[in-house]
């Protein structure tokens, strides 16, 4: 599965801690992330992560394009509630995930449910509906 990681500044440390906790599960999948989030997670976990531009420089749009091309299977975007309303990136990523039926977590509680589902194989339907070449 292809997993995208994104986090607002005040949630980056939470994303790092989440990825440390679930490194064993994440290691079996391909991960991409916006630049700073991905660098922090890679440094803390040793996981190989494809880095896109920072969100402010267009990284959100790069991940959004991969969602639109059905190249992302799961999105973890830890949102700061104080930034949520003004964040066009959150709204666009959430809209694309809804449009293309991509599981999306905007907080750690939902991310834990999705990551456990990933571990159990609950998301394997993505491989059937959208087979990778």
Regions found by a protein language model. Give the residues of each.
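Short hydrophobic/aromatic-enriched beta-strand-loop microsegments
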Residues: 30, 47-57, 126-128
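Short, acidic/small-residue loops that bind anionic groups at enzyme active sites
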Residues: 32, 94-114
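Short, acidic/turn-prone active-site loops that include or flank metal/cofactor-
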Residues: 53-60, 81, 110
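Mid-chain, well-packed structural core segment of small domains
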Residues: 60-99
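Short, glycine-/small-residue-rich phosphate/pyrophosphate-handling segment
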Residues: 109-133
